[in-house]
UniProtKB/Swiss-Prot annotation:
Ranges where the record places region Disordered: 576-608
Gene: dnaK
GO MF term set: ATP binding; ATP-dependent protein folding chaperone; unfolded protein binding
Induction, as annotated: By stress conditions e.g. heat shock.
Family: Belongs to the heat shock protein 70 family.
Composition skew (Low complexity), residue ranges: 576-598
SUPFAM superfamilies in alphabetical order: Actin-like ATPase domain (SSF53067), Heat shock protein 70kD (HSP70), C-terminal subdomain (SSF100934), Heat shock protein 70kD (HSP70), peptide-binding domain (SSF100920)
Described purpose of this protein according to its UniProt entry: Acts as a chaperone.
Protein name, UniProt field: Chaperone protein DnaK
Species of the source: Streptococcus pyogenes serotype M12 (strain MGAS2096)
Top-rank taxon, per record: Bacteria
One Pfam entry name: HSP70
Lineage: Bacteria, Bacillati, Bacillota, Bacilli, Lactobacillales
Amino acid sequence: MSKIIGIDLGTTNSAVAVLEGTESKIIANPEGNRTTPSVVSFKNGEIIVGDAAKRQAVTNPDTVISIKSKMGTSEKVSANGKEYTPQEISAMILQYLKGYAEDYLGEKVEKAVITVPAYFNDAQRQATKDAGKIAGLEVERIVNEPTAAALAYGMDKTDKDEKILVFDLGGGTFDVSILELGDGVFDVLATAGDNKLGGDDFDQKIIDFLVAEFKKENGIDLSQDKMALQRLKDAAEKAKKDLSGVTQTQISLPFITAGSAGPLHLEMSLSRAKFDDLTRDLVERTKTPVRQALSDARLSLSEIDEVILVGGSTRIPAVVEAVKAETGKEPNKSVNPDEVVAMGAAIQGGVITGDVKDVVLLDVTPLSLGIETMGGVFTKLIDRNTTIPTSKSQVFSTAADNQPAVDIHVLQGERPMAADNKTLGRFQLTDIPAAPRGIPQIEVTFDIDKNGIVSVKAKDLGTQKEQHIVIKSNDGLSEEEIDRMMKDAEANAEADAKRKEEVDLKNEVDQAIFATEKTIKETEGKGFDTERDAAQSALDELKAAQESGNLDDMKAKLEALNEKAQALAVKMYEQAAAAQQAAQGAEGAQANDSANNDDVVDGEFTEK
């Protein structure tokens, strides 16, 4: 069975891992980094992903960041003169990760386990699966990020029982999960979180502070200047990271804008104390989900054995202190918070292929599921933190006499009224025989699969007629849209491959020209005139082809030059070998003379 890669598709950074033997290994990107910025930019018709895209974010307005925050919505982003869905942009990131994983493995990759925040709803999970499909990946499993982290943490601890709390604060989302580990079973007891809280929010606090201070001093609002704002974002992220290691950092942005008197510069120092003050409310928001998860798991703090920190934002000292204060425990630092989720996803891939044995993952649904009933009430069929996959049925009836049809309004959330929860979809069960209200028996069944994706069935128990749908959110993509996007992605991949081939050829040509010119110079006056002239002629022809830019001509002339250069190199080698042989012969003769002299015995002359 081919390898299943594990992908952590993050808001600010993503990572890919693969199982090698029994070890999960992070695959470095082409720049040698173990995580890849979740950034996509467009330039001259080319799609650029990762570090290169992030570097040009300041100067290139066609750059998309933090697309994960829009997953599961109908919101589109404009770039490159086109509109893109969040699924398409995410697919470009996935395609890039897939590409360099294939380069590392030396084989095609077609399957993946992709992680999502535990608190992602059905629409967001479906959007993630669609993004994988567009990228040419069969998504074998959608796994909650804290669960994947626990899997990586607990793989070598299957012989002992423990309860762990995973505190996962990423770039754009926050999750808390409580798991019980024992005998290879990873059982999620409860999960809670906030999909609108992450490292980006901490950056934004610094940006707002810098904008306000600059406006106070210079009367100019930098938030209205797109390029200045991007520079502020980069500076804020760097300052945040600096303050995890030092207590004060300098923010220096020369020529940030211009005033009536000329260019203006932003120079400001930011202390950790000030940063903590600016972000106090964000840190405070992490506490409620921790308490909620403990309450749902029916556990006290004393029953938690370990606290695992996941996500780059858990490096913020105030966050670490808040976790200590809230749990009464020193966090376990045995895992890398940036890499552990992708590693866990790769382990789950190994479970699916059978390479990892005796491991069972029992995940939960993060939000309650149900339907709208009379009076706009939300009636739950499946409570949050129910282990998945699961199925639950309940019988309902009509609200009016002779009602011919019932509308099934499917919802996800925790509020008592339907209007306050997230609509997953609507469908209708028709042709109900005429009967007084309350008589028809309508059985509604909810199914949640292992990926947390929902399907609903309504059945008239009198006529046995049923209606069945896999929930597609109003913001989701149709199969036709997914197919079109897959074709676009394939076309882009072909164009990218062609572009890479062109670049490789041009580099090869440059290298061949440089090497041949060097050889011709070195062999001047050494008697290889025929071979040197042939190589020079082939070199001139290749340079002319290079000037014209005709790739086929360049390829042909490169082959011709390589042939002539090889002939010249052979002559050089033969001459060098002959010279070496002659030198060895001379040494041999000298050695013989020395040996003959050794036979002469010195006599002693005595005068009489």
